[in-house]
Amino acid sequence: MSDAQKFQLGTIGALSLSVVSSVSIVICNKALISTLGFTFATTLTSWHLLVTFCSLHVALWMKFFEHKPFDPRAVLGFGVLNGISIGLLNLSLGFNSVGFYQMTKLAIIPCTVVLETIFFRKMFSRKIQFSLVILLLGVGIATVTDLQLNMLGSVLSLLAVITTCVAQIMTNTIQKKYKVSSTQLLYQSCPYQAITLFVTGPFLDGLLTNQNVFAFKYTSQVVFFIVLSCLISVSVNFSTFLVIGKTSPVTYQVLGHLKTCLVLAFGYLLLKDAFSWRNILGILVAVIGMVLYSYYCTLETQQKATETSTQLPQMDENEKDPLVSAENGSGLISDNGVQKQDPVWNSNKDFQA
């Protein structure tokens, strides 16, 4: 099996793990929040991250992966930013209607595209842009209902979108810049994410629910679903970093909308949730957008691989392996065969707020 085939197989595995684990945790949390009344989402997320860190620490002790320290300021900034983005998304849901919150989630893809284009000079073809528009249109039809606006909610949503986009772009960029795996990055950033949410979680949850997480009555059922949710979250967090590292932040967001469609379909088929022809139409349009996005991405990847292979014989002996050169951070081959620098985050500048 060639390296390219191994990479494709690993990517498919990461995408599959992300879908299965994310849908599973949504089902578990739906039972915990809707049925059992445990509405403390931010605090629950901090517990997820603590369990994830403990699990990775055990895996490190068993030598399943190697600890690779790198720029501590980069880790701190990245971890805190991730924690803030999660808190802002929860606040956005609390201070906005469900419809406006769904619009907030839809805005993440175009915002990511704009940021990557401006700061990383990454080009998205017309075909890719077209498929993303179809996808967002479908998800919008299926999920967006009322659009009640208020100033505080709008500001929180804007901040949530920006921090989420930057955090996901950094997830991809840091792995490439410091040559760390998704597991190594998750292990080092998890404590900072967990501490950020553990400190702010009870306050945010109290603000949104008017309840105290520590005064909640923890029955055996509640404890069971909390433990189950935390265990599933290990797979969710791991697959998130894995997918973004192997693909891109935009692809991860496309995958996120696939999960939304699957959750809607699950709710209708098994839980008998209310479903309309609008939901069905939206899901079908979204699926068409996802298929087009996957097809165009695969097509462009194959075209670039073909162009690179035809250029290799024409290069000097010192330039025979551009992929290794790119991996070492020395440059990338652009579409016209000219070598260009790969822009990276400047830890001294980009992690100081």
UniProtKB/Swiss-Prot annotation:
Protein name: UDP-xylose transporter 2
Function: Nucleotide-sugar transporter that transports UDP-xylose and UMP in a strict counter-exchange mode.
Classification via SUPFAM superfamilies: Multidrug resistance efflux transporter EmrE
PANTHER family, per the entry: SOLUTE CARRIER FAMILY 35
Subcellular location: Golgi apparatus membrane
Molecular-function GO terms, alphabetical: antiporter activity; UDP-xylose transmembrane transporter activity
Originating species: Arabidopsis thaliana
Superkingdom as given in the UniProt entry: Eukaryota
Transmembrane portions of the chain: 7-27, 31-51, 75-95, 100-120, 132-152, 154-174, 194-214, 224-244, 250-270, 280-300
InterPro entries for this protein: Sugar_P_trans_dom (IPR004853), TPT_transporter (IPR050186)
